[in-house]
UniProtKB/Swiss-Prot annotation:
PANTHER family: DCTP DEAMINASE. Belongs to the dCTP deaminase family. It catalyses: dCTP + 2 H2O = dUMP + NH4(+) + diphosphate. Pathway: Pyrimidine metabolism; dUMP biosynthesis; dUMP from dCTP: step 1/1. This is dCTP deaminase, dUMP-forming. It comes from Leptospira interrogans serogroup Icterohaemorrhagiae serovar Lai (strain 56601). SUPFAM superfamilies: dUTPase-like.
Length: 173
């Protein structure tokens, strides 16, 4: 089952933590998250799954930044979230999709117990000017059945910003 907006509001501070939180971003069954001003772009192609891939930082000015097709931009939400006893999921807003912007490639699924900023895997299918602070995605919550084991991986937990892929750590096992 997906939580309603009223149920999300009721669980804020308990099962759900969103920082900063504004009731204005609450929807009937989700909560809008905003785009932070920083982006990362990989600087060496091809990317290699077995090693860390270098990236450079871009800052989205108030006047906007032109995103181009064929480039993966890593961004993050302005809000950090923490979820217990629920499964958080992230999707792009339909208004953003109608402009040809995707906010994630495959990472729209969060684990129970995840806390931190959501790294966004941004791409555009046509040139698009983006702005910092725009509500680009929405988080919604599923209930669980069965015994709950919270996410404890050190790879992405309690992040402090945008994270490039750490898949290379899987090869070190």
């Amino acid at each position: 089952m997906i939580l309603t907006g009223k149920e999300i509001q009721k669980r804020i501070g308990n099962d759900i933590v969103i920082t900063p939180y504004s009731e204005k971003q609450l929807n009937p069954n989700s909560y809008n998250l905003r785009l932070h001003e920083e982006l990362l772009v990989y600087t060496e192609l091809p990317l290699d799954m077995k090693k860390p891939n270098p990236a450079e930082k871009l800052v989205i000015p108030e006047s906007g930044l032109l995103l181009k097709p064929g480039i993966l931009y890593l961004g993050r939400t302005l809000e950090s979230t923490e979820t217990h006893n629920l499964v958080p999921m992230l999707e792009g807003r339909s208004s953003i999709g109608r402009l040809g912007m995707l906010v994630h490639v495959t990472a729209g699924f969060g684990d129970v117990g995840f806390k931190g900023f959501w790294t966004l895997e941004i791409s555009v299918i046509q040139p698009l000017i983006v702005y910092p602070g725009v509500e680009v995605c929405q988080i919604f919550y599923h209930t669980l059945e069965g015994q709950i084991t919270e996410y404890t991986s050190g790879k992405y937990q309690a992040n402090r910003g945008i994270q490039t892929s750490m898949l290379y750590k899987d090869f070190e096992k």
